[in-house]
Amino acid sequence: EMGYDVSIEENGRTGKKPLHWEYLENKDRKALHDSYSRLIKLRNDNPELFTSTSQFSWEVGTSNWGQGRFITLSSTTKHMLVAGNFSKTDGAYTVTFPVTGKWYDYLTGDEVEVKDATQKMEIPAHSYRILTTFPCLN
């Protein structure tokens, strides 16, 4: 994904579209591309989090709009928490982690020490955080 400027209807919805690799020269489009690449890598490198045997919970309904939205995935050895703020203002949201200990901000690589399973997390407006119990390996 690079923020395409060509309509989905050009050459039909599923028709071939011109490739615009020059988009990667724009820092915002490069950042968007890199974010999608890391999300795909997360999915491909950690299949055990995305199987029918993993534990999955989500709080993403309309009633969760003001309290933040959360998705939690757990396997026997790994945990992932996605926390999103889809409002117009920055927020501090109560987050419940499945385990305490060392976590990682998957998109920045920063370590996060989780001492209490329930704690507040700052999330800017229109943003999200992905926290994992394993580091992102480039």
Report each predicted region and the residues it spans.
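C-terminal beta-strand-rich structural cap/linker in extracellular carbohydrate-active enzymes
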Residues: K115-N138
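Short hydrophobic-aromatic micro-motifs
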Residues: L81-A83, I130-L131
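Conserved protein kinase catalytic core
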Residues: Y4-S7, G91, E111
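Glycan-recognition and catalytic regions of carbohydrate-active enzymes
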Residues: M2-M80, F86
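Solvent-exposed beta-strand/loop surfaces of large extracellular or lumenal domains
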Residues: D105-T118
